[in-house]
């Protein structure tokens, strides 16, 4: 952790050096050393780690620089000078733009995926609670429907056939409970009020 600060500073420094050198310089010389645990030449100091080496080398490659005389043996115990060849400015610009484009595409895909996941979890079915109708108006409507479609329904006592059932009552039709939707009111005679703000129509 103690080497993170110097490492970050050195990385930014060399990125600037490499980009500036790509403006027109054919080659840039960077001082590298050979780590004790690896034979890979790497820029750094006495506190340089293998991770620092790989990170700096990756930045060099992304910026379009390649090492000259890669197979030249390095001397141990001293800081060796290694030459890097800079690619033309257009190639550096092109590689940077392609990298940025890839990052933007990946970011956009991840953003769309996260938004879709959040919306799917937050989506709730819209429940509409119908307004509770006036029982007297409903009874009058059912009476008018019955008189219209069943004009010869019977005697005067049949007027009581259209009535409001108390909450909790059940109506049996042909030996079993018969419940239909309120939209089927034309074919019904009995209205059940369950007491929850909605009405259930039942055939008699």
Swiss-Prot record:
Record-given protein name: Putative membrane protein ORF19
Source organism per UniProt: Ictalurid herpesvirus 1 (strain Auburn) (IcHV-1)
Q: Where in the cell is it found?
A: Membrane
| Residue intervals passing through the bilayer | 4-22, 90-106
Name of the gene encoding the protein in the UniProt record? ORF19
The membrane topology of this protein is:
Multi-pass membrane protein
> Where the protein is mainly located, per its record?
membrane
> Could you give one GO CC term from the UniProt record?
membrane
The entry's keywords: Membrane, Transmembrane, Transmembrane helix
